[in-house]
Amino acid sequence: MEHIRTPKVEQVRLLQRRAGQRKPLLGTLYLSATHTIFVENHPETRRETWVLHSMVSGLERPPGGPTGSQLVLRCKDFRVFHLLFPLERDCVDVHASLTRLSRPESYRELYCLSINPNTNQEEREKSWSLVLPSQDYQRMGLPNNLWVATAANSEYKMCDSYPAQLFVSRWASPAVLMGSSRFRSRGRLPVLSYFHQDTLAAVCRCSQPLSGFSGRSEEDEQMVTAVMKANPGSDFIYVVDTRPRLNAMANRAAGKGYESEDHYGNIKLHFSGIDNIHVMRSSQQRILDVGEQRTPSMSDFLLGLENSGWLKHIKAVLDAGVFIAKAIADEGVSVLVHCSDGWDRTAQACSVASVLLEPYYRTMKGLMVLIEKDWVSFGHKFSHRYGHLDGDPREVSPVLDQFLEVLWQLAQQFPCAFQFNERFLLDLRTLAYSCQDGTFLGNSEKERRSLRLQERSFSVWSRLWRDREKYWNPLYRAEQSQTQGVLRPNTTPYCFKMWKGLYSPAETPAPPAQTPVDFLSSVREGSQQLEQELANQQEVAAGGPAPLGTRQATGSPDRGANQLPEGGGTQEED
Amino acid sequence: MEFAELIKTPRVDGVVLHRPFMPTVEGTLCLTGHHLILSSRQDNTEELWLLHSNIDSIEKRFLGSLGTIIVKCKDLRMIQLDIPGMEECLNIGSSIEALSTLDSVSLMYPYFYRPMFEVIEDGWNSFLPEDAFKDLEAMTDEWRLSEVNRDFRVCTTYPPLVAVPRNVDDDTLRKAAGFRHGGRFPVLSYYHKKNGMVMMRSGQPLTGTNGRRCKEDERLINATLRPGKRGYVIDTRTISVAQQAKARGGGFETEANYPQWRRIHKAIERSNVLQDSLVKLVEACNDQSHSMDRWLSKLEASNWQTHVKEILTTACLAAQCIDREGASVLVHGTEGTDSTLQVTSLAQIILDPACRTIQGFQGLVEREWLQAGHPFAQRCSMSAYSNSKPRHEAPGFLLFLDCVWQVLRQFPCSFQFTEQLLVLLFEHAYASQFGTFLGNSAAERVRLSLPEKTVSLWSWVNRPQEIDHLSNPLYEPNSLVIWPSVAPQSLLLWEGVFLRWNRSPRCQEEAHEEMVHIIEYNKELQNKVNSLRRQLAQLETQEPPLQTP
């Protein structure tokens, strides 16, 4: 590779404090096209450390000492590596190379797009068909007599950050769609996100209206009425503006803003008070600092946690979801959700509400579909938010992190409700940042299509699905009360904890204790092997194929629910 | 009977009861000498039986002729009684207040309680010092059981039997006792089988301002050291607190007189500070209207988690000296009945796998708290809601249980019991039908004839059905020393106690049931497979291969 000045440096010391390491390792550092690789000299262990270039978020060169020159490597998964080079020249070279390698200027430079697309063609195509938003609309029973598909955006002409496939109220004419789109920031008109089959209420999403202080659009008002009409059970809808009220009001001065209850006769307005991406970015930096404090006192820690504001923001996101879920499930009233552009806070609020409302989204497959639909297809700007390319650092913000953390917080309250475990959330987070697959590249469906990602890369979902055994929550059982129906979390502040697995993984007891998840998973695995042996032995004992059914009949009929389905799930025909 | 004088109104009809996570019940309220009872006289609702001694304080409110009494319990629960009629309400209120603050121990419920279960093993005999010593004797002959305190004269807060170095005679012990706070001369707390090192505990040495010394005391503790080895004195107080203690006749071991000992000072807080923390913490937990910022700052300001961290850190230090440094340790604070016991008992949880079993943990509580003279009656007479000014009250035992919970949470598979056992001990330490936690010392328990006149908590706990209920399905005996992380990020608020009445336990219970289910199912399969294997093996041996066609 043209950017690698020195492919190999010997006698380098590496220290990773965050992993609980105390003494540096001595070894050789290699730079490849994709990874920084460190191989320990120790002949017995030869431990290897691999760091993807795309995971590097920062490089620093603190002043060197008599023992050599230092390079600090910070990663997007919050790992920090301290490297010590014997020669300053090597350090300078590695620094320069990594600076360039970790900040690709175009998608072309990304490793996942440099593979030969024609090998594994079948596998690649299969990987992209594993999770499709269309499957989810089908699952919700759409289209139906209330919600219909529209071709208005099939060429991305009405809204270039929306998907081609949109579901809208049956009562909205093409003219109303166009007019409403023109009156919404970046053309993001109200469309369906989630349809609740029990109450017929729906979660819809859009961006802020271009109302300014007094602007109106007849079509947009008709559009909102159409959303209301698509729910036969109620004569108004909630408009949830996920921003703090002050921010929403300030937007009016720029010709944007929020819906006036006077102009839209059939709405009730609710503000959720979720702060913007800049506040979130600096808040996360502060909670990271809290996690990295060396030997803090309890007061340092708790005050640091408070000052970071992070848990307050997590609570705000969950509260927004709870408000929407209650409106849908308890009141049977549809909700229209927006923030400013409708691709960050709106994605968070809609998907949190969906997880609370719909047990399917608490399964691995369900969460994948939800993220594919609410985030990927609806134009959450993955490449900007997670810094895939060298760009404006002010566009970077941990929006998806917060959604995943809300799920983690929920799993603390409902240990049996989710099919997946903490590892799944952590790995999913890493994959959103790491550019190893095509799914999260780009900022919209349109951009992804023009990059021809499906022809040039794999989908992230097949990678996660392949490892599903590792992500299984042993306490999950489909028929438990918390698995069914609507989740009603307690959102009192004392219910929120710092997500230690993400922000402070180094502080562990010694010897490392087995987690209940690992323990129960291994027991569960053991049970499966025993079941197998039992079946075999019964066969031998009976001198022929024994009635395998004894277990299902007498033992534990519910066990069937614990088996992970093989293959890609239900819609495999295509 | 005196109770009747205190009960102004024995029963009121039409009382409405509100309690956490249960439907509202309307029924008859009855006051007896020991209980507040509310019964709807219908089969499908659960009656309320509340011990008066569990009531920490009450609050009365009136709306017209409808009175409301909020009963705040020592186990931190709050219940509300709506009582029609102002006079009835006032009478009930003052009766409860009188009955819940009875001074005389002999009027306490344990003296009246008759067990409704069969006592399989009398808990009063389950953990006798002589039995514990038999285990020690099997490991070493360097220690003996001394009867120097047979009649509680040498030390009023020690049990009649204590383990001391074999080559130190009772006379030396008596003299050393004169040099230690409350007569609490250094005695054996724990013997570390792996390397023969020991942990001892005592009261502070009475050096005073002019640096008194006591040769016998020095000889006693030096007798526990191996030749050429040094030991550690862990003083649970800061150096400045220890210095100040000199003015009141106390003090600490100086380098000059104890050259073979290195002294380390820690900063575990004293009783009134701890009580204050408990009150603040519970107040913060009960206010659901807090914003996130306010909650975190209230939690911080209560300092509760700071105490947890400090106590665990000190226990880890003691354990480290013994296991890693291979040195013996003497632990004391001022009296040696509070922070000292927190440290010595937690260090044993860390070092000794036997303390992590159900029986072993009871034995630890018996040895290091009850026999060791933690003044339960004084410390646990009031809890977080009491309005009166605390005198001797302090949640030292609750803090110990909290620390055990932290370790249990970090090592979820290493304890034979669940959190439930810890919660149960917390409840019974503050209010109980059993006599175990009455009195302040072994001497008092003898004087009060508790073993003869009351039932032991251990008699109840150690029945198969209760053991079953307290067992941890994830338990796998772990013979290792376990080192908990004491970083603040690793220490959590003990929800099982402090948020117990604010959050529904249903989902966590479901998770627990599921764990039990997974493990039971595995055992069941294991049994089936084993019996099939045996059958197959039998078939093979009985039937030689002659029946081939």
What are these regions (language model features)?
Chain A
Residues 341-347:
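Ser/Thr-glycine-rich phosphate-binding loops at phosphate-binding pockets of nucleotides
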Residues 1-335, 351-574:
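Cys-dependent protein tyrosine phosphatase-like superfamily
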Residues 337-339:
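Hydrophobic anchor at the beta1->P-loop junction of P-loop NTPases
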